[in-house]
Every structure is written in structure tokens, then in C-alpha cells.
Design a protein with these regions (language model features):
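Mixed-charge, low-complexity interaction segments
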Residues: 1-30, 133-137
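Short, charged surface segments at domain edges that flank catalytic/cofactor-binding sites
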Residues: 14-80
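Cys/His/Pro-rich metal-binding microdomains
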Residues: 49-50, 113-117
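Histidine-centered nuclease catalytic patch
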Residues: 54-112, 126, 133
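Cys/His-rich metal-chelating microdomains
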Residues: 55, 118-122
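Short Fe-S-cluster ligation motifs
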Residues: 77-94, 100, 142-166
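Short flanking/linker segments adjacent to small metal-binding domains or redox-active Cys/His motifs
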Residues: 152-191
Length: 191
């Protein structure tokens, strides 16, 4: 292609590029997930990072610890790394697209996996093959629930924490999702 361009034949360069390495635009779609959608994926995956197999912790369990111990376990509302405990990057679960949407992957549950914020940032728009990563099998939420049972039980025992809108919102979503999975609000799986 470059040889054709150097020879002044832009049309031939375009043809070669289109044939051997074409640009395929992907429609941009906005992605926003409800707390319940996130929790369904986290429970389905057993609160495991599907890229590393590492245990993840319920988002509001981490935030509750930050509310209780802000000096020792700080969390910045806008994820400022210099003002947040590193656990928020290592252990905080998020949804990632196994096949990136930017690369043509579908924004649907069959293409969603649980991962940490850290690995989500590292993966970005790359495929597992490009990174040399593999997909770990899902965990079992009856063995590890990401401290969901602890979180709901702690809020129930400390109702003043319901004043925190983030914690209250995640509490409602967690109780609902645990109901879908037939877990009591405060059942703790073995660790």
C-alpha cells in the first residue's frame, strides 16, 4: 500500500488497504447498567474476576467500609486514585464486555463478565486473545458472595447508614437480587 502511495497511485493504495486491512466502523452505543443488572452478573459469576479468578467484593460493602473508616479506607466519589484506597481498583467489581463493544461485541448479558476496575482499565478495547488472557470459569455465589450478606446485615444492624444514598440504593438492589437467588438478606456463605 505504501509503495503504491509512494508511486503516486493513491487509488491503488486505497484498493490495497480496503482489501487487506479495511476499516470497519462500529456504531457507538451508550452503556449504563442498573445496580440490579450488575448484581445479577456478579452473582452469576460468583463475585470472581473472570479474567484473573480473583475474588471481588460487593461495591457497597467496600463503600460501607469507607464510610465506617474513612481515614484508613478512603474512597473518592470520582475515583481519584490518589485519594482512594487501592482496594477500590483491585476488588471493586464492574461489568466488562468480553468482546468489546468498540470491536463489534454486543451490549447484552451474554457478553458481560465480572472483572475488577483495575483489569477493566487494562483490558480497555482489546480482546482476550490480543492480551494473552483467558476467561476463568465463574465462581459459586454460595461459596463467596462478595460480602453481600455481611453488607446487608451490617446495614440492618446499623440503620443510621441508610442515610447514605449510595448504601441505601445498593442495599435495596442486593436484597432484591438475593431474593432472586433465594438467599436471605443476611445469609453468609462459607469463606
Amino acid at each position: 500500500m505504501v509503495a503504491a502511495v509512494d508511486a503516486g497511485d493513491l487509488e491503488e493504495g486505497r484498493l490495497i488497504l480496503g482489501r487487506e486491512y479495511p476499516f470497519t466502523p462500529v456504531a457507538k452505543s451508550s452503556r449504563r447498567y442498573t445496580d440490579r443488572q450488575c448484581l445479577r452478573v456478579f452473582y452469576r459469576d460468583g463475585f470472581l474476576d473472570r479474567y484473573s479468578g480473583t475474588k471481588l467484593v460487593h461495591p457497597a460493602a467496600l463503600r460501607a467500609l469507607s464510610v465506617i473508616m474513612p481515614g484508613e479506607f478512603p474512597a473518592h466519589p470520582n475515583w481519584l486514585m490518589s485519594q482512594s484506597h487501592f482496594a477500590f481498583w483491585e476488588l471493586f467489581p464492574t461489568i466488562d464486555h468480553l468482546v468489546p463493544v468498540a470491536r463489534g461485541g454486543a451490549d447484552e448479558e451474554s457478553n458481560w463478565v465480572s472483572t475488577s476496575m483495575l483489569r477493566n482499565s487494562a483490558k480497555a478495547h482489546w480482546t482476550l486473545e490480543e492480551l494473552g488472557w483467558t476467561l476463568s470459569p465463574p465462581g459459586d455465589y454460595t461459596q463467596w458472595d462478595g460480602l453481600s450478606g455481611w453488607f446487608t446485615g451490617y446495614l440492618e444492624a446499623n440503620p443510621d447508614l441508610f442515610a447514605d444514598k449510595y448504601l441505601a440504593r445498593w442495599y435495596r438492589a442486593t436484597v432484591h437480587t438475593r431474593g432472586e437467588y433465594r438467599l436471605s438478606a443476611t445469609t453468609h456463605p462459607p469463606n
